[in-house]
Amino acid sequence: MTKEFHHVTVLLHETVDMLDIKPDGIYVDATLGGSGHSAYLLSKLGEEGHLYCFDQDQKAIDNAQVTLKSYIDKGQVTFIKDNFRHLKARLTALGVDEIDGILYDLGVSSPQLDERERGFSYKQDAPLDMRMDRQSLLTAYEVVNTYPFNDLVKIFFKYGEDKFSKQIARKIEQARAIKPIEATTELAELIKAAKPAKELKKKGHPAKQIFQAIRIEVNDELGAADESIQDAMELLALDGRISVITFHSLEDRLTKQLFKEASTVDVPKGLPLIPEDMKPKFELVSRKPILPSHSELTANKRAHSAKLRVAKKIRK
């Protein structure tokens, strides 16, 4: 791993091992990031196996081309620079219409958080950006400075689950009427100023939830995850598995709901026989989410909110 792209992989063994890797299988890492999951997965593949890696951040791909070089030389890896919401179309274009397993590590990777100029962090002074794909048009600056008051309230409440969403949106509206809000620290101070003193004494940074909300809006994270996970579940071969790591309640709720819909059947109680085409196509590999071990939590504080859910395809 290059120094510029240092990333500690969360739930490394659990995420990959739960895919029940076949040496000659076709797999997808939908969120390449620091390439930790990819490297471990590739170590389990034989010469006939192949891994397709998606990331919309060119730096992640550049880093992986160094760290995964031995597998690249053997022709076992294909990198695809794109949002994972286009996963099905991109794989189909490469002649891949069925996969044996796929993993997602949702959210922002550590290098993106740590790279000051990306504007993801409320702890470092930087321009308001928050784009995972540097070529996309919508930035945090546009959201903060051009979205109407009601839209800001909606985003803050829906994606940040912040009970002071109205007060924060009002404070932003007042500030930007005087001059544009340009920096992360400037926004963080406005958020703090909008909250009552007793709220500021609580654990955690007061701007965390609002920064999360803006980041989700800029990158359409939930919409992309919803589309991509559903497409991935369609692409899975019989006995294929999907692993999804989430870091906040919105992602986890989405994943849990998609897995629940695919693994349960909605028919009247007492029906003697369930028609074959109505039987669930998936089963949950683990009923409850898998959490990081105590040792992992000690070694990596960013793992504390991680949850892993895994499902297996049992019918085509």
Curated annotation (Swiss-Prot):
EC number: 2.1.1.199
Gene Ontology BP term (one): rRNA base methylation
Chain sites annotated for binding S-adenosyl-L-methionine: 35-37, 55, 84, 105, 112
Keyword Hydrolase (UniProt): no
Signal peptide: none
Superkingdom of source: Bacteria
Key words of the record: Cytoplasm, Methyltransferase, rRNA processing, S-adenosyl-L-methionine, Transferase
Location, primary (coarse class): cytoplasm
InterPro entries in the record: RsmH, SAM-dep_MeTrfase_MraW_recog, SAM-dependent_MTases_sf
GO molecular function annotations of the record: rRNA (cytosine-N4-)-methyltransferase activity
Annotated localization: Cytoplasm
Catalytic reaction equation(s): cytidine(1402) in 16S rRNA + S-adenosyl-L-methionine = N(4)-methylcytidine(1402) in 16S rRNA + S-adenosyl-L-homocysteine + H(+)
GO terms under cellular component: cytoplasm
A Pfam family it matches: Methyltransf_5
The keyword Cell wall biogenesis/degradation appears for this protein: no
UniProt family annotation: Belongs to the methyltransferase superfamily. RsmH family.
Function of the protein: Specifically methylates the N4 position of cytidine in position 1402 (C1402) of 16S rRNA.
Name the record gives this protein: Ribosomal RNA small subunit methyltransferase H
Organism: Streptococcus pyogenes serotype M49 (strain NZ131)
Lineage: Bacteria, Bacillati, Bacillota, Bacilli, Lactobacillales
Protein's gene: rsmH
